[in-house]
Regions:
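C-terminal catalytic/motor cores of large multi-domain enzyme assemblies
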Residues: 1-151
Length: 151
């Protein structure tokens, strides 16, 4: 809702969807501590943010307790701080699961690299229209690749 000062992007919805998936598949809401798998009881979701100095991963804490608008506002604020080089270390630590989006630069597929010590990361590619033909007509169907890297 831009009138309320919040631009809602697909990332906010993907964060919420990831929380729902992590609740259903808690094995992926974990991190590695040496040889031990540590299961998390909270949902801190990181997202890759491109900065002039490279990628950083700010973390939306307790994403399960926030709505889409609140997540949209927070990801926007964290991304702005990242671009300005003003993120604090605690704003980039403690994630359980991360999202890496390549859509902004036009990629339709890639393999995201896990943000250690997390055990999984979701890639968000750019959507596109795929031509599909049947015996009667040609149509274009929306496609979106969501690669998931697991450890």
């Amino acid at each position: 809702n831009e009138k309320a000062g919040v631009k809602v992007t697909m990332l906010a919805f993907v964060v919420k969807a990831c929380v729902m998936a992590l609740k259903k598949f808690p094995t992926f809401n974990a991190s590695l501590d040496g040889d031990n798998l540590v299961f998390k009881q909270y949902f801190h979701i990181g997202f890759a943010a491109d900065t002039p100095n490279g990628l950083v991963v700010p973390v939306v804490r307790d994403a399960d307790k926030k709505g889409v608008f609140e997540i949209a506002r927070e990801t926007s604020e964290l991304a702005k701080l990242a671009r300005e080089g003003k993120l604090k270390p605690d704003q980039m630590q403690g994630g359980c699961f991360s999202i890496s989006s390549l859509g902004g630069i036009g990629g339709t597929t890639f393999t995201p690299i896990i943000n250690a010590p997390e055990v999984a990361i979701l890639g968000l590619s750019r959507s596109y229209q795929k031509p599909v033909w049947d015996e009667r007509k040609q149509q274009f169907l929306p496609q979106l690749t969501l690669p998931l890297s697991l450890s």
